[in-house]
Amino acid sequence: MNESYQPTLIEQLAQEYWEENETFEVKEDLSREKFYCLSMLPYPSGDLHMGHVRNYTIGDVIARYQIHKGRNVLQPMGWDAFGLPAENAAIQRELPPAEWTRKNIKKMRKQLKQLGFAYDWSREITTCDSTYYRWEQWLFLQLYKKGLAYKKNAIVNWDPVDQTVLANEQIVDGRGWRSGAVVERREISQWFLKITDYSEELLKDLDELKEWPEQVITMQRNWIGQSQGVIINFNLEKGPDKLQVYTTRPDTLMGVTYLAIAPEHPLAKERAKKSKKIAAFLKKCKQTRVAEADIATQEKEGIDSGLFAVHPLSKEKLPIWIANFVLMEYASGVVMAVPAHDERDHEFALKYDLPLKPVIEPADGHDWDYNQAAYTNPGKLINSGSFNDIDSKTAFNVIADYLKNNGAGSRQTHYRLRDWGISRQRYWGTPIPIIYCKTCGTVPVPENQLPVLLPEDIIPTGHGSPLKETASFYKTRCPVCNKPATRETDTMDTFVESSWYYARYSCPDQDKVMLDDRAKYWTPVDQYIGGIEHAVMHLLYARFMHKILRDLGLLNSNEPFIRLLTQGMVLKDGAKMSKSKGNVVTPQSLIKKYGADTVRLFIIFAAPPEQDLEWSDSGVEGAYRFLKKLWGFSYRIKDALLAVNQQKERSNYQWEAPEHRQTRQQIHECLQQANIDMERLQFNTVVSAVMKILNILIKLTTDNDAEAHLIREGTGILLRLLSPITPHISHHLWQSLGFGGDILDTPWPRPDPKALQTTELELIVQINGKLRGRIQVPTEASKEIIESTALNQENVQRHLADKKIKKVIVVPKKLINIVV
């Protein structure tokens, strides 16, 4: 053992030991309790950033802690390798995305290994490998057979110059990020997964997720968006057709003064054929982004269609307007407008001089100026004929029943959640296994022809779809009639890959089936770690896919992740680290200067996992100083500890002196609190406990046999508490100080109940309920001794002067109250 702390050397030695001994490669073992710890897999950008390091350090602390607790721990790592960023990088560098991606993976794998994470690298997966996406294509075929994968028209952001679909973040001021062309809303045929079939179960099973952050549960609940409402039929004034409207406020039905339909509604398209003004308006609407948030905040605009609908109750004529704020994807693309009781409808009505008809007044009867603002709260019905004077809640049921009895509507449970559009008009993604034949129509690729391989030698240009221009890919033969046919050139949303990867880690070597029984052993994931930004999309899709895999008989649980931790961001100067802000700190430079253990220790100590972490150079220096202090202490006590560790009776040592028992009590109290905090994932306070223990031990001397044994016990506790956080130095010191074997094979320390037993208690002394002092008494002191000690306390005597004691109340082991 060197006198000076040399992190580069000891970290290299520890990592070589783990690799040579396959320390973290695990097998299924039904005789042991399993623990599956997983951090969200990274996109291989080429460089680890501090956000990665924090995420994976937290996960590694949890995994190593569970190893110490004797569990069979799986902690794998892989790469979310498909997607737009790789394609964009390839366009800029004029090289195939496959080449760019695999080079980045190689670099990032090396960086992860430098940090000493306890990953089972034998299970590594890369989502752009055909051995992985083959099973994704197989899964798509199963969904297609069950009617859960289907194709329909949907609205997208279309770049007319690059001839491609754009994500919302690729649009800058209404123009394509590359071409600068004005982006259009275009309707194209796309593939969807029927997640809405699972809406009710996805909502209900949120109640099972007792160890998820409440914020995430709320976000998912709102995204699924269950509401109870009514479908109302509005017949068109002319002809047999009708418009169906979904509303959660049937109590406002008598206040409808117009209907609004989406620009993509068939009725709007039909009217555009007969009106140049309407056609021009629809064209203008196409230049709006498809994101719901953008549509909600844009200026409300519309045009009169010239058509009328008939109110189902009053039989009044209602004008039908085409409005840019109505979403075709929500309900039926028709809104019943009640401007007196809806802010958006109110704004639109004032702009286009449409009538307002108040039908609800405040329940307390105070006046409301409906021209100034919509009254949106429940209240009492007015101007509603036979429904007058009833409250909104009652009116919901009364009007819903009336509509049903008169064939004009029906109750409906509605979900905000829409089916998952998985088509991407991109190259770098999983090919959708579908063939189009002029004779046979849409034909799924036979399972024995999987995988449909993505050509990896393409250099995308950013113009159009590369797969449509690659004849060797899209030209094929129909598997049914053997005539010439074409392949689907859309690829799958990368959220599909990340919706089931956690299960594939259980059996990445399986080439006969998607998942085998090992998946049932390892899933669900016991602890999942990732950012709050994935609260809805990724986590919801993974929950959906887990239920699909369960229904296919491949898994036997309802939910993918038992416990979820959403770690905070890493900030510098109050802002998230980013290249554009110039506030990035690279992990590699810190590892080179201080070592991986210092980086890990700072990350863990600087903030609780769920809170944002403010970067501090002095904090990193402080972590490094602590590890040097630990090393120096260990070097000083090494010879004494080696000697003590060779004694046969070292584990049964009895401390007689009160000062030694008190010191031991302090150490075990720190351990007790650290264990509580480990279970609560409050690792920063575990580090605080370790620092306290080291400060206690440093004051002891190895010249005294009792203290040498105390140092041995305390150091053994300290190193095991640190082992998940700073594994390299803990591994090295454990062996160098003669504790024997691999520290990871040793059980997690538990406080000794005898050490925690105290010989004295501190009691609060009150006079008439007010704190007047504290006393120390033996733990087994009688009521009489407690009373006597309290009454003789100097401050108590001062407050008792000239007062008569009525009674003395002793609350055992807590307080004594003197009533005067």
Swiss-Prot record:
One of its GO terms (biological process) is leucyl-tRNA aminoacylation. The keyword Cytoplasm applies. The keyword Protein biosynthesis applies. Transmembrane segments: none annotated. Its EC number is 6.1.1.4. Its main location: cytoplasm. ATP binds at residue 579. It is found in: Cytoplasm. A motif ('HIGH' region) lies at residues 42-52. GO terms for cellular component: cytosol. Belongs to the class-I aminoacyl-tRNA synthetase family. This is Leucine--tRNA ligase. It comes from Coxiella burnetii (strain Dugway 5J108-111). The gene is leuS.
